[in-house]
Amino acid sequence: MNPEEFRQALLDHGIALTDAQMAQFARYYQLLVQTNEHLNLTAITAETEVYLKHFYDSLTGAFAYPKLQSQALTLCDIGAGAGFPSLPLKIAFPQLEVTIVDSLNKRINFLADLCDDLGLTGVYLVHDRAETFAAKGSPYREQFDLVTARAVARLVVLGELCLPAAKVGGAFLAYKASAVNDELKLATGAINKLGGQVAGTTKLTLPTKPEAEERNLVVIDKVAKTPGKYPRRPGVPAKKPLINV
């Protein structure tokens, strides 16, 4: 997917990028590849792959959660790495107020330089672990309209890490690959216990070659407060996931 194909694919979904926004994506790509030479940010570096598997993939969240396109939401991206999905969303929808959490300070420094270079305002960077960022007593707990995660961790783990940051009436948007049904079955009990309720899954395909890749965007509404004991201390959610609770 080259930049013009990226622009057209979004337009097909009603998202029209300006020339200035396209220039921001081009600069994002340039800085990502430059920095990646000395800091391991991504295994994907070819322009067509970055535009498809990072930029376009990040923006598919707006297909599943249309409020992103029109409302001035407070968005928290947990474990954003090189800024995905939150910074492509911020470029496309500048009214968003974005908080990015990552445990590696080098990535936070890259994101700070990137936001400065792109002229992005309303982006806040927090160097912290997901387990402690929205723990009981944290000023960030249950503060955000939408929490996103595009991580490889299982949904049952992501739910414990992300739902505590979402405000009641807000939501958690999980970007998952294929075969999400089994993950959902395992995670539903934990999601309910954490104050969440699965609202639905949007299935789509990325136009990759030789075969299209399946994506699933899971929207979990925050319907009740998360019990104070969650999330558990660092490392525990992944080692002892809340299965059969």
Curated annotation (Swiss-Prot):
InterPro entries: rRNA_ssu_MeTfrase_G, SAM-dependent_MTases_sf. One of its GO terms (molecular function) is rRNA (guanine-N7-)-methyltransferase activity. Pfam families: GidB. Coiled coil: none annotated. Keywords: Cytoplasm, Methyltransferase, rRNA processing, S-adenosyl-L-methionine, Transferase. Its main location: cytoplasm. Transmembrane segments: none annotated. It is found in: Cytoplasm. S-adenosyl-L-methionine binds at G79, F84, A130, E131, R150. Its EC number is 2.1.1.-. It is an enzyme of class 2 (transferase). One of its GO terms (cellular component) is cytosol. Belongs to the methyltransferase superfamily. RNA methyltransferase RsmG family. Specifically methylates the N7 position of a guanine in 16S rRNA. This is Ribosomal RNA small subunit methyltransferase G.
